[in-house]
Amino acid sequence: MIEEEPNLVNSGKSQRVVVNGYPFSIEIYRLETDKTWTLEVVDHEGTSHVWDEQFRSDKDARNTALQALEAEGAVAFMRADNIIPFRKP
């Protein structure tokens, strides 16, 4: 019997924000079988920043993203020196 993959649940707390004139997408999601939420912030060039930490609530995840964007500013999220590239096969 083939096991079905769990569905991805997107939070209603996900949103788009503009910081220092740059648009960012705050994406908050979890697998339907999980209790904790994943936080991802995507900049205007499509670069994704995913938190290692999981969040007990989608509200906590959203607040963390907003606080980080406010404290660090848009440029900190757009620097290339803080990105770990995927390994090439």
Predicted feature descriptions by range:
Residues 1-4, 47-89:
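Mixed-charge, Lys/Arg-enriched low-complexity segments
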Residues 25-27:
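A short linear hydrophobic-aromatic micro-motif
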Residues 9-12, 45, 54:
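Intrinsic disorder/low-complexity detector
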Residues 9, 17-19, 41-42, 50, ...:
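Extended aliphatic helical segments
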Residues 29-49:
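Short aromatic-glycine-(Arg/Gly/Cys) micro-motifs in beta-strand/loop hairpins
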Residues 1-23, 85-86:
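Negatively charged, low-complexity tracts enriched in Asp/Glu with abundant Ser/Thr
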Residues 16-19, 33, 65, 82:
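Sequence-pattern detector for short linear motifs
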